[in-house]
């Protein structure tokens, strides 16, 4: 599907997937605009702290059953970290275990100043990842 941008894509995904009370795991920090999109669809947000390597997957909660997880793995916004392949695999395994989707906003993935590009989450699990 082609949209006018990430905001429209996230709004459409939220309207399609979310019902009042559904849980969404988000990176912390993340923009207020993204939080508002999910809240407007009735979601309860659960923030996962971010470090220099993106979302800290060791902190994914065992007691939550999210509808989806929102992440910016190639260039975490606003801090800029890139999620290493080990964490990407952990995130995919968690989504399989909890039967949730991963919403991958591949913001700035094409801009690399060092090293080879890291595989997108969607490339690692195309059936579970919604790629924006």
Language-model regions: role of each:
Residues 1-99, 110-111, 116-130:
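Conserved core of the PLP fold type I
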């Amino acid at each position: 599907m082609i949209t006018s941008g990430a905001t429209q894509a996230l709004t459409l995904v939220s309207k399609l997937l979310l019902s009042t009370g559904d849980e969404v795991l988000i990176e912390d920090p993340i923009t207020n605009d993204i939080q508002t999109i999910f809240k407007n669809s009735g979601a309860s947000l659960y923030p996962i702290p971010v470090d220099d390597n993106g979302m800290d997957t060791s902190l994914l909660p065992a007691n939550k059953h999210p509808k989806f997880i929102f992440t910016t793995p190639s260039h975490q916004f606003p801090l800029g970290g890139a999620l290493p392949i080990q964490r990407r695999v952990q995130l995919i395994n968690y989504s399989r275990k909890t039967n949730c989707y991963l919403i991958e906003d591949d913001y700035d993935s094409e801009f690399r100043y060092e090293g080879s590009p890291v595989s997108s989450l969607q490339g690692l699990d195309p059936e579970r990842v919604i790629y924006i």
